[in-house]
From Swiss-Prot:
Protein's UniProt keywords contain Cytoplasm: yes
Chain residues that bind ATP: S32, G33, G34, M35, D36, S37
GO CC, any one term: cytoplasm
Alphabetized GO MF terms: ATP binding; tRNA(Ile)-lysidine synthase activity
Classification via Pfam families: ATP_bind_3, TilS, TilS_C
Catalytic activity from the UniProt record: cytidine(34) in tRNA(Ile2) + L-lysine + ATP = lysidine(34) in tRNA(Ile2) + AMP + diphosphate + H(+)
Lineage: Bacteria, Pseudomonadati, Pseudomonadota, Gammaproteobacteria, Enterobacterales
EC number: 6.3.4.19
Name this protein carries in UniProt: tRNA(Ile)-lysidine synthase
One Gene Ontology biological process: tRNA modification
Name of encoding gene: tilS
Species annotation: Blochmanniella floridana
Record-linked NCBIfam families: lysidine_TilS_C, lysidine_TilS_N
Subcellular location(s) of the protein: Cytoplasm
C-alpha cells in the first residue's frame, strides 16, 4: 500500500487526525450518523487499515483500536432509524459498535435550554461508556468552533470563554478525568463536505439542526452565512482569535502559577486572606485559576464576586454555602475556601445503618465510601508497646475491597482504628449527626459535648454530619477517624479482651476506605485513631 496514493487529495484531513490521535491507542468515536462523524469514522478506519498494514511491514507505527457509540436520546421519532444506520456503517467497516439509551423522560421535563441539557446528558453517557485507557473522539469542526465563540461573546465571556474548544482536553466527569479529542477542529465544513461527496459516503440528516429556536442553530442558519458572504475568511479569523485568546490565558496562568500555587494547598483549598490586599482584577484571576482546578470553567463576574463577598468575607460562624457550577458548592472554614461535591450540603442525620454481620463490608451513603471490620488477635507485648504490625494497620485483603460506585481501582484507606469487639448482646450500627449529652473519650477524665470535640479536632461544620458514628446498641463507640470513646477503647476494656493464654488480645479493626476524590476532601481532618 503506497502512502502517497493512500492519502492523495485528502492529505490535510488525514494529517489533522493523525496529529491528534498519534499518542493514543484506544479510541471511542461518538458517532451520530451525521456527515461530520461519518467523515471522521471513514478517516479513522482508513488510517487503522493503513497502520495495521504498516506494522506487518518494517514500519514501527503502532496500530490503534477503534470503537463507535451512538447515543439514543429517544427525542426524535427517527432515532431508531439513525441507530440502525450507524450499526450498518460500522459493520461495513468492521468497527465494534454500541448503542447507549438515555431516558428521554428526564429531558422532556426540562422547560428551558433543552439543547444544553441534551448535550450534557450525551456527554455523561459517552464518558460512562469509556473503557480504561480509552479516549473519546468527537467530530467538531471549525464551523462549530465559530458558533461556540459567538455564543460565548453573546454571554459576555472574557478570553477564557472566547478561547472556544480545544483539540485535546481533559474533562472532569464524576471523580475521574477523561481525555476528549476533536481531530477535525481546524477543518472547515466545506472540506468535510467535499470529502464526503468524493468518497460517496452516506449519512443521515437531523431535521432539528435547522430549528432556529435553538441559539446554535440560529447562528448556523441565519447569522454566520451573512458574515461569510461579507467576509469569506470569517470562520478562519474567528478560529484564529480563539487560538490567541487561549494562548493569552495559558500565558497568564504560566506567569502567575508559582505565586498562585502558594495560596492553594495540596487538597486544593484556597488560603484567601492574602487576597484581601489584592486588586479586584487580580483577585478574580486567582479565584478563576483556583476554580479551573475543579474543571469549573468560565465563571462569571457575578459568581466570582459572590464567592468573595458571600463566602470568603462572611462571618466566621455564618456557615455560608454557595453553589458553584452544576455539581459543587463553595464553603469556608477558618482562613480557607473549599470546593466540595454538591451532596455534602445535605444532612445525614436520618441515616441509621444496621451492621448485622460485623465482619462484612458496609457501604456508606452519599458516596462516602465503605467501612470494613476485621477481628484480630494481636500479641499482648506488641499491643503494650504500640507496635501493632504494619500488616494490621494499613493493608487490606482484596476481599475487603469490592468495587463500589463504579470506581476503577482508585480506593484509598482513609483511616484505621482498633476498638473492642462487640459483646454477644450488642447490635452494631452506623449513624450520622449530633449526639446529646457529654461524651467521655478514651484517656480523658472529663466529658465534653460533641460540638466541642469537633472544634478541638478542627473538623469543619460541613464535614461533621458526614463522619460515620459507630454504635454498639445505643452506646457511641467511635467517630471513625476522629476519636474513640471510653466504651470503645481497647485499653480501658483490656481485661475483657485478653485471651485465655494471657499472651494475646482480641481487637476489632475498622477501616474507612474512600475513592480518591473524597479521600482528598477528608484526609486533612481524619486520622488513624489506633486504639
Amino acid at each position: 500500500m503506497n502512502s502517497t496514493n493512500f492519502f492523495s487529495h485528502d492529505l490535510y484531513l488525514y494529517h489533522q487526525v493523525i496529529r491528534c490521535i498519534v499518542k493514543y491507542r484506544n479510541l471511542l468515536l461518538a458517532y451520530s450518523g451525521g456527515m461530520d462523524s461519518t467523515v471522521l469514522l471513514d478517516i479513522l478506519t482508513k488510517l487503522k487499515k493503513y497502520f495495521d498494514f504498516q506494522v506487518k511491514g518494517t514500519s514501527k507505527i503502532l496500530p490503534f483500536f477503534l470503537r463507535a457509540v451512538y447515543v439514543h436520546h429517544g427525542l426524535n421519532n427517527k432515532a431508531d432509524y439513525w441507530a440502525d444506520h450507524c450499526l450498518q456503517q460500522c459493520k461495513m467497516r468492521n468497527v465494534p459498535f454500541h448503542i447507549i439509551y438515555i431516558n428521554h423522560s428526564d429531558l422532556s421535563k426540562i422547560k428551558c435550554n433543552i439543547e444544553a441539557m441534551a448535550r450534557d446528558f450525551r456527554y455523561k453517557a459517552l464518558f460512562n461508556a469509556l473503557k480504561p485507557e480509552e479516549v473519546l473522539l468527537t467530530a467538531h469542526h471549525m464551523n462549530d468552533q465559530v458558533e461556540t465563540v459567538l455564543l460565548a461573546l453573546k454571554r459576555g465571556s472574557g478570553p477564557a470563554g472566547l478561547s472556544g474548544m480545544t483539540q485535546d482536553i481533559l474533562y472532569q466527569h464524576n471523580e475521574y478525568q477523561h481525555r476528549l479529542l476533536r481531530p477535525l477542529l481546524k477543518c472547515s465544513h466545506i472540506q468535510l463536505q467535499e470529502y464526503a461527496y468524493r468518497k460517496k459516503l452516506t449519512w443521515v440528516e437531523d431535521d432539528t439542526n435547522t430549528d432556529v429556536r435553538f441559539d446554535r442553530n440560529f447562528l448556523r442558519v441565519q447569522v454566520i452565512p451573512l458574515f461569510q458572504k461579507r467576509w469569506p475568511a470569517f470562520n478562519k479569523v474567528v478560529s484564529r482569535t480563539a487560538q490567541l485568546c487561549r494562548e493569552q490565558e495559558n500565558l497568564l496562568h504560566e506567569l502567575l502559577s508559582e505565586s498562585l500555587d502558594q495560596l492553594i494547598d495540596i487538597d486544593n483549598a484556597l488560603f484567601f486572606y492574602p487576597l484581601i490586599k489584592y486588586s479586584d482584577v487580580r483577585r478574580r484571576v486567582v479565584l478563576r485559576y483556583w476554580l479551573s482546578r475543579f474543571f469549573i470553567n468560565m465563571p462569571s463576574y457575578k459568581l466570582l464576586d459572590c464567592i468573595w463577598k458571600e463566602v470568603a468575607l462572611s462571618k466566621v460562624d455564618s456557615q455560608s454555602i454557595l453553589h458553584v457550577g452544576k455539581k459543587y458548592i463553595c464553603r469556608r472554614f477558618r482562613k480557607k475556601l473549599y470546593i466540595l461535591p454538591d451532596n455534602m450540603k445535605s444532612s445525614l442525620d436520618i441515616f441509621l445503618l444496621p451492621w448485622k454481620n460485623f465482619n462484612n463490608t458496609i457501604l456508606l451513603p452519599n458516596e462516602l465510601g465503605l467501612l470494613t471490620s476485621q477481628s484480630l488477635t494481636v500479641n499482648l507485648f506488641l499491643f503494650y508497646k504500640n507496635l501493632i504490625p504494619y500488616t494490621h494497620l494499613n493493608m487490606l485483603s482484596d476481599i475487603f475491597l469490592p468495587r463500589y460506585h463504579n470506581n476503577v481501582g482508585d480506593e484509598k484507606i482513609l483511616s484505621v482504628c482498633f476498638i473492642r469487639p462487640p459483646m454477644n448482646n450488642e447490635k452494631v450500627s452506623i449513624q450520622f449527626g449530633y449526639i446529646q449529652g457529654l461524651l467521655h473519650l478514651a484517656n480523658r477524665d472529663r466529658g465534653r459535648k460533641l460540638k466541642k470535640i469537633w472544634q478541638e479536632y478542627n473538623v469543619p461544620p460541613w464535614l461533621r454530619n458526614h463522619i460515620p458514628l459507630l454504635f454498639y446498641n445505643d452506646t457511641l463507640i467511635s467517630a471513625i477517624g476522629i476519636f474513640i470513646t471510653r466504651n470503645g477503647s481497647c485499653i480501658v476494656n483490656m481485661n475483657n479482651l485478653i485471651c485465655n493464654n494471657k499472651k494475646s488480645i482480641i481487637l476489632q479493626k475498622i477501616t474507612w476506605v474512600q475513592s480518591d476524590f473524597y479521600y482528598r476532601i477528608f484526609k486533612n481532618f481524619v486520622y488513624n485513631t489506633l486504639r
